[in-house]
Amino acid sequence: VSAREDGVIELRSEGFEPDIVRVGDGAAYPRFSSASLISGIAEQIAERGYTVGGFDAYTVSSVYKGSGLSSSAAFEDAVGLIINDMFCDGALSPLELAIISQRAERDYFGKACGLMDQAVCAVGGLVSLDFADENDPKVTQLCPNLDGLGLCMCITNTGGSHADLGDEYSAIPAEMRSVAEYFGQRVLRGLTAEQIISELPALRAEVGDRAVLRALHFVRENERVARVCRALAESDTDAFLGAIAESGRSSAELLQNVTVPGSSREQGVTLALALSGELLRGVRSAYRVHGGGFAGTVQAFMPPEAVESYCRGMDAVFGEGACRLTSVRGEGACRLV
């Protein structure tokens, strides 16, 4: 990264055409473009009273694009960090940068998204997020990595992409919201599975079965989050794996985000989950869909001695290098030098 005096941000990413943005020109950059993200981040930081200048930057990434590995959030947080470091003396907190990144993706890029990906990338480590107050979410770093559990995490890219699945992804919160509205609420938080089950006949008629199933997933998933947090705090490997396995089954059966409706020829995520079950049979492990689902990646947790054979088996089906042993970095978006 290097500064420039003409108020232009030129960002070149390996393998992509350069993005050129003139700071403060008020231009509307094409939606779904990296330039729109850069412009949105710079504009929001300027609105907070900082003088944002130009710079040149070159980025290299090994994150699979559109695979559910938060590639857009990583890009956004990197741009925000550069501007924060160069023009704000580091005054913006990781959470502030995450909120700026989310709004850039939602309002400038044009894709509906939550705050989870941006917050985790900005903060680093294993993180819990509480959105009771959407304007002031609580972010807690639980631990820096998985070392305390004696587990490794492998991510397998099944070859599908999230890039054209916006409608499927957006339907999930919309359907959950329809259940919340039935109970006179804006969101599902605070409802119990028992409340939903007690109203099943009426709910089925009003919102449909899939919406009900997704709502049940939501309320139980929040319970599992609390269990995972306790397991990490207590280094309880069995409790952690149990909750992850339950979450994976619930995603497939209730949330229904492992296949694209109507797609019978390509079901990469479902196949990867089934293959994981075969490869990890008898191994202390857990696996589930990763990211927004429908396509992209799966995650699997296992002891170190199981990694080599697991990756070999997954690569044999999804291609050389599809399965990667990954680590959780304790530090989020940061300046290295």
Which residue ranges define each predicted feature?
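Short, solvent-exposed positions on alpha-helices
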Residues: 53, 95, 117, 238-242
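N-terminal pre-core extensions flanking Radical SAM catalytic domains
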Residues: 292-298
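Short, internal active-site loops enriched in acidic
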Residues: 60-66, 103-106, 196-197, 293, ...
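C-terminal nucleotide
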Residues: 2-36, 44, 128-288, 300-337
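Anion-binding (especially nucleotide phosphate/pyrophosphate-binding) glycine-rich loop
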Residues: 1-100, 280
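Fold-level recognition of mixed alpha/beta catalytic cores in primary-metabolism enzymes, strongest
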Residues: 67-155, 337
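Short, hydrophobic/aliphatic alpha-helical segments
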Residues: 52-63, 98-107, 249, 268-286
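Alpha-helix capping and helix-loop boundary segments enriched in small/acidic/polar residues
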Residues: 29-32, 66-74, 92-95, 106-110, ...
